[in-house]
């Protein structure tokens, strides 16, 4: 029997993905076997290959889905027109999106090294689209004499680098609230471009 009695194929692939995400974020990609993923999903090891040909495919799909969802979620936002407000909105958006997805964010940054060259390029392309969003905000702000950036690309990467590190240290029950963190981060970002 390839599938646990009562399971449904249409629910199995998302279940496998969720289990793999959890295992990769807890143990690291290299430490997790296909057999472990199958066992947690209630599948025989061989049945897992009906959904994913290998562990690399699971990882790449998780990372691609994370980046595509990030871009789609941004695209669905009602954005302010003014660059100052849009930059603050970007900071808030990034913080909210990433703090609500700790496992996805962890593997998105920590497991890039385990991607094949082709899959790495796919993720880099999607990350580049996200970086372009911030670069455009900064470029528009510079054009309107609201921001001063010697190098838009470096400034964008520095801001995103600072924002992405939030997931490594922020604790919901820590000494500062999310609102306080957002306020401080927006202040830092605005000072960096003034």
Listing of model-derived features with the role each one plays in the protein:
Residues 1-11:
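N-terminal intrinsically disordered/low-complexity leader segments
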Residues 62-88:
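Amphipathic alpha-helical linker/stalk segments
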Residues 4, 15, 19, 23-57, ...:
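Helix-turn-helix
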Residues 88-109, 156, 160:
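Helical hydrophobic small-molecule/effector-binding pocket
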Residues 99-118, 168, 172:
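Amphipathic alpha-helical segments used for helix-helix packing
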Residues 9, 59, 63, 67, ...:
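Amphipathic, non-transmembrane alpha-helical scaffold segments
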Residues 68-71, 118-143, 153-157:
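Amphipathic alpha-helical packing segments from all-alpha helical-bundle domains
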Residues 1, 93-96, 100, 132-140, ...:
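C-terminal peripheral helix-coil segments that are non-catalytic and often amphipathic
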């Amino acid at each position: 029997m390839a599938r646990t009695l009562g399971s449904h194929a249409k629910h199995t692939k998302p279940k496998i993905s969720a289990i793999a995400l959890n295992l990769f974020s807890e143990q690291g990609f290299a430490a997790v076997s296909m057999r472990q993923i199958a066992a947690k999903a209630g599948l025989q090891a061989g049945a897992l290959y009906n959904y994913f040909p290998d562990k690399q495919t699971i990882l790449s799909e998780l990372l691609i889905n994370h980046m595509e969802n990030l871009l789609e979620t941004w695209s669905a936002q009602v954005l302010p027109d003014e660059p100052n407000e849009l930059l603050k909105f970007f900071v808030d958006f990034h913080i909210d999106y990433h703090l609500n997805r700790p496992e996805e964010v962890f593997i998105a940054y920590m497991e890039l090294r385990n991607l094949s060259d082709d899959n790495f390029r796919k993720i880099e392309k999607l990350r580049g689209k996200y970086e372009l969003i911030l670069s455009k905000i900064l470029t528009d702000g510079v054009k309107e004499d609201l921001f001063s950036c010697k190098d838009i690309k470096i400034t964008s990467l520095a801001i995103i680098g600072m924002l992405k590190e939030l997931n490594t240290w922020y604790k919901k029950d820590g000494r500062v609230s999310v609102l306080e963190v957002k306020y401080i981060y927006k202040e830092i970002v605005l000072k960096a471009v003034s």
